[in-house]
Each structure stands twice: as C-alpha cells, then as structure tokens.
Amino acid sequence: MSPQTETKASVGFKAGVKEYKLTYYTPEYETKDTDILAAFRVTPQPGVPPEEAGAAVAAESSTGTWTTVWTDGLTSLDRYKGRCYHIEPVPGEETQFIAYVAYPLDLFEEGSVTNMFTSIVGNVFGFKALAALRLEDLRIPPAYTKTFQGPPHGIQVERDKLNKYGRPLLGCTIKPKLGLSAKNYGRAVYECLRGGLDFTKDDENVNSQPFMRWRDRFLFCAEAIYKSQAETGEIKGHYLNATAGTCEEMIKRAVFARELGVPIVMHDYLTGGFTANTSLAHYCRDNGLLLHIHRAMHAVIDRQKNHGMHFRVLAKALRLSGGDHIHAGTVVGKLEGDRESTLGFVDLLRDDYIEKDRSRGIFFTQDWVSLPGVLPVASGGIHVWHMPALTEIFGDDSVLQFGGGTLGHPWGNAPGAVANRVALEACVQARNEGRDLAVEGNEIVREACKWSPELAAACEVWKEIRFNFPTIDKLDGQE
C-alpha cells in the first residue's frame, strides 16, 4: 500500500491512498477508562504486515476509508478514530496475531447493541487485505454499560419470583420440536411440570406455524402451568416463544402472555435481532415477565476459530441488550463447548466483576457495575448420568434443561421429569455434604436409584450414550 499522492492546490490536501498504520497504529496510546476495547484475531493476506493489518481493522471499523478524503479536515480524527494500540502473536500460529483496538465512546449510540456491532463487526470483516478476522473479546466500559437496562430482572429477582433457592433450576424442551397440535403440546408441558420440573420450553423454531398457532399454544400451556402448580404447590413456568416476523407482532404475543399471568416468555435473540430483543427486554421489565433467550444461529457466527465472533462477545452483548436466561452450551452434551472457555463466559454472564484470565479466554477485566446477571442454560444432549458434572460445572445459578433426556424416558414424560428431579436433588445433597461430584458422581446417581425406580429406568436407557467428538474452537495452546 505505497502512498500515491497528488497535491490539489485549490483545496490544500493530499489526495490518494496512504498506509493505514500512519494514522491508526498507535502503540504509544494509553487506553482510557471510557474506551471500548476489542481483541481481534487477525489473519492478514500474504505480504500485509501485522501493523498495517491491525491498523486497517481499527480504521475500517471506525473513521477510516480506503482513500484520503478532504472532509477529514472538518472533524478531529484524533478524537474519533479507533486505534490499534497493541499487537501480540498467537501461540502456535505463524500467520495470526491478536490486534487490540481502542474505540472512543463518542462513536457509539447510547443503549444500542445494534449500533455498537454495526461499527465493530461491520464491513471490516469483508476487507480484502485480511484472509480472516475474528472478534475474540470486548471490554465494555461502565460509562457505556450504564446506558443499558440489561436483563429485565436478573438472578436474585427470578429466584424470589419462583421461590426456589439452593439448587439449579430444571427445564425441558418439548419434543418433537415441530408437528404437535396445541392441545397435545400442552399435555406434554403438564406432564413434565407435574413430574417435578421448574420449566418447560418452546423449541427455538416454534413460532406460529399451521400445525400450531401461537395463541392456541399459549392458552394450552397456561392451562398446564396452572394445573401443575395447583397439584405440586410449586411455581411453574413455560418459555412461551414470542419471536415473530415483526417487532409489533412479537410485543403482541408478549402482551397476551402477560394477560394470561404466566411468568416467562422467550426470544431467539440472534435471528430476531438486537433491536427487537432490547425492545422485548424493556417490555418484560415493565410488565413483570422473565425473559428466556435462545441463541439459534450462534454457531454460524462463533464456531470457526479464525473468523467471526466468539460467543463470549455475543454473551456480553446479550447481557447489555437484556435477557434473564441464555443457552450457554453444556461441555458434556451434544453441542460444541470447551470447558474453560465455557466457564469463562458463564462468569461473564453471572458475575458483577470478572478479572482478565487468558487461561479461560477472557482478554479484558469486565466491570458490569449494577447490571443484573443472566442465568446460563445448559441444554443439548444431556441426561441423568450428566447431572453430577452439570451440577459441579454450572453450580446453583443455572438452568439444566433436558429435552430428550426427559421425554425419552421409557415410561413417559412425567417419569422422565421425576428421574431428573431425583438425580438433581441427590447431587445437590451430596455436594452439600462435602462429597466430590467430579469423582463420586456416578456412585451418587446409582445410590439415588434405590429410592427412585424412575431414575433407575433412565440410568439403564442412557448408560451407553456419549457425544465424544473433539472441540473445534479450543483456547490457544490447547491443540
């Protein structure tokens, strides 16, 4: 990218192309407390130096363009430009490096994840000088965090609403995910809640299809909730998916859920979009509804190690946009999820203050100030034999969600729910007594089988089920 300039005497500036690093690579820059900081994994095209590639990322995601423009003289680039302030190698990767970029806060609209992402992960990801680009992490400064409402309620408020303490919450996704009539769907919801689960859930692609329109589903699920509550004395819920083709229709569905008196609704936040999600989160806080978030489409964005965006960034964005639960992988189930990386973004979802810890993929210290936390949801290919590991990995402030692991029980839906509840209670009691779930987990489950034929049957059915595939997106240095 050699400079090619000609002087326009009538204007008094040099037109043409100049190297990005001359303006946007500033290793001497000291970051401000108000800057949004980004860590990018950069794979430049052959012949493009790291400093030029890192500067190009900073430029194209902030104030820069491919050529010099005379209107640069009408503003202060020093005030508004992004800056690549540090570059470090990636262990074991000769062609990759991490570029750290600082963005001034004035570049972003207050309270808008949509605007933040449009800049930081916008056109720059198609830049020809880069073979691949991945956003690994963001530091959201408190000054920007305070412009967001965040989760509608948060962990403590949810526990108080449900009157459930001292253990993970239990859920189940109703299967088959598509094709049931509303009445049969409601029957499955009732059986699972009656058997001991706290929640049941619409699958992410259940919206309002010809076989089951949303209003019918909402009505039969509400009936199931009230009937199971009356019979068990426990507060129950079903994640009613309000995701729709327009924001207006989505809010209409949430309004109907509130009128039914149910405790929680659901949204597919990536396919629905951050603008829609933030709008729904505001409605939920104003109207006392909890909000469950599904991350459908996330693997399109986050699964490949060299290009896209890590889920820890999507998790931070969700905490800003708003949600009380979000799916976060399982580590032990059928879906992708490295253990240390998963534990890292689980902390980013739940905790108020998280220290930088590269061993868990956390590039920046994050202070959420007063923003409520989000419950991570473990879901996907899990069953009763996984209960000790899930309890040990995710702890009490989580939702453990068994779809096939409930509805696949040989005796039916309610016995499947009983099996999961007994296994969970046994694991929590054993942990509270000081037993090591990681070492004694299988023994703890077997002991509980003596008191629960439903659990014994579940253990027999799923004793050989494994999902032993290598993790694709491992932390650096784990290959």
Curated annotation (Swiss-Prot):
Keywords: Calvin cycle, Carbon dioxide fixation, Chloroplast, Disulfide bond, Lyase, Magnesium, Metal-binding, Monooxygenase, Oxidoreductase, Phosphoprotein, Photorespiration, Photosynthesis, Plastid. Its cofactor is Mg(2+). Its main location: plastid. InterPro entries: RuBisCO (IPR033966), RuBisCo_large_chain_AS (IPR020878), RuBisCO_lsu_C (IPR000685), RuBisCO_lsu_C_sf (IPR036376), RuBisCO_lsu_fd_N (IPR017443), RuBisCO_lsu_N_sf (IPR036422), RuBisCO_lsuI (IPR020888). It is found in: Plastid, Chloroplast. Heterohexadecamer of 8 large chains and 8 small chains; disulfide-linked. The disulfide link is formed within the large subunit homodimers. This is Ribulose bisphosphate carboxylase large chain. It comes from Lobularia maritima. The gene is rbcL.
